[in-house]
């Protein structure tokens, strides 16, 4: 075996030489209690003074500064919210005005277009009425001319038929009155 390891004889001898007892842990020694309490009191007083005079004011200042910053930010946010609400109201009012103007412009344009369309329709109707009247005059003149030609042709045809069938020359007045009676109806 290795030296120092597992040597039970050496361990027993060492314990037996000390008598089996060692000195107590220093904080538990009765002789040093008073000096330890004084040292502990001085340390806690020093720690209290450092914390209360240096650290707490700094931390308090930081907390106070942070609180002021938060309050300032909240006030600025409230102000900006009010401004944005006002801007939104102004935008909505402008939008409503724009809508009403657009509707008015649309109505005005619609009225103008309707009036223009009505005027154009009336002009077109007048032109068509004039064209129809001209066409009726032309038709009437053409009919009169055609009827005049038909009378002449009918009179000649009737005279030719009578001469062919009867072998006589018919009277022109009698022939014209018979053709006129036949044409009238």
From Swiss-Prot:
Ranges annotated as biased composition (Low complexity): 9-18
InterPro entries, per the entry: ATP_synth_b/b'su_bac/chlpt, ATP_synthase_B_chain
Transmembrane feature ranges = 37-57
Compartment(s) of residence: Cell inner membrane
Q: Which UniProt keywords apply?
A: ATP synthesis, Cell inner membrane, Cell membrane, CF(0), Hydrogen ion transport, Ion transport, Membrane, Transmembrane, Transmembrane helix, Transport
What membrane topology term does the record carry?
Answer: Single-pass membrane protein
Give me the ranges of the annotated region Disordered. 1-23
A Pfam family: ATP-synt_B
Q: Does the keyword Protease apply?
A: no
Establish whether keyword Disulfide bond is in the entry: no
Provide the Gene Ontology terms for cellular component: plasma membrane; proton-transporting ATP synthase complex
Q: Could you cite one Gene Ontology molecular function of this protein?
A: proton-transporting ATPase activity, rotational mechanism
What does the record give as the function of this protein? F(1)F(0) ATP synthase produces ATP from ADP in the presence of a proton or sodium gradient. F-type ATPases consist of two structural domains, F(1) containing the extramembraneous catalytic core and F(0) containing the membrane proton channel, linked together by a central stalk and a peripheral stalk. During catalysis, ATP synthesis in the catalytic domain of F(1) is coupled via a rotary mechanism of the central stalk subunits to proton translocation.
Provide the assembly information. F-type ATPases have 2 components, F(1) - the catalytic core - and F(0) - the membrane proton channel. F(1) has five subunits: alpha(3), beta(3), gamma(1), delta(1), epsilon(1). F(0) has three main subunits: a(1), b(2) and c(10-14). The alpha and beta chains form an alternating ring which encloses part of the gamma chain. F(1) is attached to F(0) by a central stalk formed by the gamma and epsilon chains, while a peripheral stalk is formed by the delta and b chains.
Similarity comment: Belongs to the ATPase B chain family.
What this protein is called in its record is ATP synthase subunit b 2
Q: Identify the species of origin.
A: Rhodopseudomonas palustris (strain BisB5)
């Amino acid at each position: 075996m290795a030296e120092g390891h597992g040597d039970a004889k050496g361990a027993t001898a060492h314990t037996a030489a000390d008598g089996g007892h060692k000195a107590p842990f220093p904080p538990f020694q009765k002789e040093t209690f008073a000096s330890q309490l004084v040292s502990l009191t001085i340390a806690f007083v020093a720690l209290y003074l450092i914390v209360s005079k240096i650290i707490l004011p700094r931390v308090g200042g930081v907390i106070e500064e942070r609180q002021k910053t938060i309050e300032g930010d909240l006030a600025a946010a409230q102000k900006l919210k009010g401004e944005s609400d006002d801007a939104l109201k102004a935008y909505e009012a402008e939008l409503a005005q724009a809508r009403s103007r657009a509707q008015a412009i649309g109505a005005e344009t619609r009225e103008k277009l309707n009036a223009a369309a009505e005027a154009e329709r009336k002009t077109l109707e007048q032109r068509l009425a004039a064209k129809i009247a001209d066409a009726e005059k032309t038709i009437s003149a053409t009919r009169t001319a055609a009827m005049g030609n038909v009378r002449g042709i009918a009179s000649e045809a009737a005279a030719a038929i009578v001469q062919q069938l009867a072998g006589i020359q018919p009277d022109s007045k009698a022939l014209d009155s018979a053709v006129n009676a036949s044409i009238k109806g």
